């Protein structure tokens, strides 16, 4: 989990330093939207599974949005992705189940992979 957070931090720093138009679609937008969806999912699932992390995953999403500084439609899509992840699991799980724990593990792994891939691809 710490690796995921560190990777997210690296990705956000890389994106802040890249020069591009605010509303132009970046080549990594699909990956950022998926990462936002994962963060939303983790925000809900870790809460019902007793992780006692408070707003940790929401704060990670906020840090991603702040670092990326999307505006207009890009910002709307990023936030919608986070909300889709949260709401999707909220409709499915009311309590922590073995399946919820499996989903958490998978999303932590996928989020770490996306963060690493983005860092490797765009850190130059």
Each language-model region and where it sits:
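Positively charged n-region of N-terminal signal peptides that target proteins for export
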Residues: 1-4
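Sec/Tat signal peptide C-region and signal peptidase I cleavage site
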Residues: 17-21
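Compact alpha-helical subdomains of small soluble proteins
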Residues: 24, 53-124
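N-terminal targeting signals for Sec/Tat export/insertion, comprising classic cleavable signal peptides
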Residues: 30-55
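Glycine-centered secondary-structure boundary/capping sites
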Residues: 13-14, 50, 69
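Bacterial N-terminal signal peptides
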Residues: 6-15
């Amino acid at each position: 989990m710490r690796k995921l957070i560190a990777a997210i931090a690296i990705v956000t720093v890389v994106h802040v330093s890249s020069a591009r138009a605010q509303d132009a679609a970046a080549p990594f937008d699909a990956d950022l939207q998926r990462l936002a969806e994962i963060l939303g999912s983790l925000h809900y699932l870790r809460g019902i599974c007793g992780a006692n992390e408070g707003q940790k995953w929401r704060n990670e999403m906020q840090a991603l949005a702040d670092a990326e500084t999307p505006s207009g439609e890009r910002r709307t899509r990023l936030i919608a992705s986070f909300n889709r992840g949260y709401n999707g699991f909220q409709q499915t799980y009311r309590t922590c189940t073995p399946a919820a724990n499996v989903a958490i593990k998978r999303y932590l792994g996928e989020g770490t992979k996306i963060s690493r891939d983005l860092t490797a691809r765009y850190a130059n």
